[in-house]
């Protein structure tokens, strides 16, 4: 049994970070590969939602999804939020797996406590369980940004999913940041202006 871990929303200017863990056998993983599973970035949103449902309802799959808000990222930092989310997944899913595979190049020092952790660069392209985790994380991020888009249509979140596209950055310059923007990120990019109150009033 392998536990795969991946995230979505790491580089966004808005919305939460989602980290997912999926544990299953190689035999079960093969079923999903036959359904067209691959790195979530290479799947359409419709296909991600389809696979998300199949993963969550499969009797032989264990999964856990952790959300860290923009506010948490601003107060703790992105790296700390990633580490905390991975710890939560390991505490909730580690008993299921004899192998733990994390997408990327860092285990955040957790390999001292969990010696069976492997970090794999582009693991979402080569390890089915990481690709499955990638689907759950990205589908959760998609859903969040579609819901937030209904509140703030000018930022194009239904299309850019919170990433810093030209339209998104231009909207921040023109309208200011929303309470769902990561202010530590927008300040770093010098695109935050003092119009926060104006958009906050829409939430009241």
From Swiss-Prot:
Subcellular localization is given as: Cytoplasm
Q: Which cofactor does it need?
A: Mn(2+); Mg(2+)
Alphabetically list the UniProt keywords: Cytoplasm, Endonuclease, Hydrolase, Manganese, Metal-binding, Nuclease
Q: According to its UniProt record, what is one Pfam family this protein matches?
A: RNase_HII
Question: MF terms per GO, please?
Answer: manganese ion binding; RNA binding; RNA-DNA hybrid ribonuclease activity
Q: Which annotated residues bind a divalent metal cation?
A: 6-7, 103
Q: GO annotations under biological process?
A: DNA replication, removal of RNA primer; mismatch repair
Q: Which GO terms describe its cellular component?
A: cytoplasm; ribonuclease H2 complex
Q: Which reaction does it catalyse?
A: Endonucleolytic cleavage to 5'-phosphomonoester
Please give the chief subcellular localization of this protein: cytoplasm
Task: Spell out the InterPro entries in the cross-references.
Answer: RNase_HII (IPR022898), RNase_HII/HIII (IPR001352), RNase_HII/HIII_dom (IPR024567), RNaseH-like_sf (IPR012337), RNaseH_sf (IPR036397)
Q: Which leading EC class covers this enzyme?
A: hydrolase
Give start and end of each RNase H type-2 domain. 1-197
EC number assigned by the record? 3.1.26.4
Q: PROSITE patterns per the record?
A: RNASE_H_2
Cofactor note, please? Manganese or magnesium. Binds 1 divalent metal ion per monomer in the absence of substrate. May bind a second metal ion after substrate binding.
Q: What family is this protein classified in?
A: Belongs to the RNase HII family.
Q: What does this protein do?
A: Endonuclease that specifically degrades the RNA of RNA-DNA hybrids.
What's the protein name?
Answer: Ribonuclease HII
């Amino acid at each position: 049994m392998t536990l795969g871990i991946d995230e979505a929303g790491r580089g966004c200017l808005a919305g939460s970070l989602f980290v997912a863990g999926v544990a299953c056998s190689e035999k079960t993983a093969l079923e999903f590969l036959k359904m067209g599973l691959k790195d979530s970035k290479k799947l359409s949103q419709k296909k991600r939602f389809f696979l998300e449902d199949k993963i969550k309802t499969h009797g032989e799959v264990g999964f856990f999804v952790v959300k860290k808000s923009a506010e948490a990222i601003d107060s703790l930092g992105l790296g700390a939020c990633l580490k905390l989310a991975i710890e939560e997944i390991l505490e909730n899913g580690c008993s299921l797996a004899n192998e733990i595979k994390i997408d990327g190049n860092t285990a955040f020092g957790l390999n001292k406590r969990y010696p069976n952790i492997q970090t794999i660069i582009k693991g979402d392209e080569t390890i089915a369980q990481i690709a499955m985790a990638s689907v759950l994380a990205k589908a959760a991020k998609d859903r969040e940004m579609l819901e937030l888009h209904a509140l703030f249509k000018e930022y194009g979140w239904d299309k850019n999913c919170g990433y810093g596209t030209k339209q998104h950055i231009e909207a921040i310059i023109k309208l200011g940041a929303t309470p769902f923007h990561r202010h530590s990120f927008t300040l770093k990019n010098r695109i935050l202006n003092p119009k926060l109150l104006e958009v906050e009033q829409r939430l009241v």
